[in-house]
Amino acid sequence: MCYTISIRLSKTCQGRGNLFGRLYVKERGETVMKNIITISREFGSGGRSIGKQVAEKLGYAFYDRELVDEVAKRSGFAPEYIEEHGEYANARNSLLFYLATAERYSHDNLSMHDQLYITQSKIIEELAEKGKCVIVGRCADYILRDRKDCLHVFICSDMASRARRIVERYGQTQKAPEKRLAEKDQKRKVYYKNYTGRVWGQAQNYDICLNSGALGVDTCADMIVQLCK
């Protein structure tokens, strides 16, 4: 059995220096340091920025766009296709995507979505084998669930903060960001459920869940760093 640490944090935790010390997993007398960090996140929560900061501060490799490029090389899929389908259900109809792909294992030929998922999974496992790294999204928390040297993080935020972030980052108009956020969340939920059987964003699936809207991106990054330093 692997012991997990669940932490609920509020804004009052900011500025406390070495808040957590080092995080280890102990099993049968063995001590394992958290060398691999997976960052799952709500769209617009700043998860990528947090992951990048963590990697820079710890000196870990960082895989986000880099993972997309590697999958493109090996699979032959265009990077744009991977960005759209590498962690999102089909844009046309999420429910139909789920129902259609639920029977994929009854067919000899894998769908393009399945081929992409399998390729991504293999690359994520290979990257983890290389050593200390931060991996953003793409079901990495599930793919690496049996590794005891992993810290699985979920980043969430309130709708207003997320809406402001995507307006600033992507130039989204003020009228539509909430709708875009809801659509992105739904597609991620369906994709994650389809390939993992788990509920995306459910606290029990992660070691720590942080609210970047309440804590701030920098504080979230610092907390994760303290857990692994």
Write out the residue ranges for each language-model feature.
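Extreme N-terminal starter segment of soluble prokaryotic enzymes
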Residues: 34-36
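Conserved phosphate-donor/acceptor-positioning beta-strand/loop module used by diverse small-molecule
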Residues: 146-169, 174-184
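Short, Lys/Arg-enriched N-terminal segments with co-localized hydrophobic residues
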Residues: 3-32
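Short beta-strand-centered segment that lines the nucleotide-binding/catalytic pocket of NTP-utilizing
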Residues: 61-72
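Small-molecule kinase domains that catalyze NTP-dependent phosphoryl transfer to phosphate-bearing small molecules
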Residues: 92-98, 173-218
